[in-house]
Amino acid sequence: MALENPKMHNSEISKRLGAEWKLLSEAEKRPFIDEAKRLRAMHMKEYPNYKYRP
């Protein structure tokens, strides 16, 4: 979406992608959810003492 609309602000891109996400079925969302879980577990293994500090 960012490549198709290079002048669009990030906030607008996020809103549109959020709207698209809400339209997906659970089956369509599942690969993304599973990948997020895999990456989270990998990060926890590689950085066990990591603490989020904004």
UniProtKB/Swiss-Prot annotation:
Alphabetized PANTHER family for the sequence: SOX DOMAIN-CONTAINING PROTEIN DICHAETE-RELATED, SOX TRANSCRIPTION FACTOR
UniProt-listed SUPFAM superfamilies: HMG-box
Keywords attached to this entry: DNA-binding, Nucleus
One BP term from GO: neuron differentiation
Protein name: SRY-related protein AMA2
Keyword DNA-binding in annotation: yes
GO cellular component: nucleus
Record keyword Flavoprotein present: no
DNA-binding feature ranges: 1-51
Predominant location: nucleus
GO MF assignments: DNA-binding transcription activator activity, RNA polymerase II-specific; RNA polymerase II cis-regulatory region sequence-specific DNA binding
Stored InterPro entries: HMG_box_dom, HMG_box_dom_sf, SRY-related_HMG-box_TF-like
UniProt subcellular location: Nucleus
SMART domains in the record: HMG (SM00398)
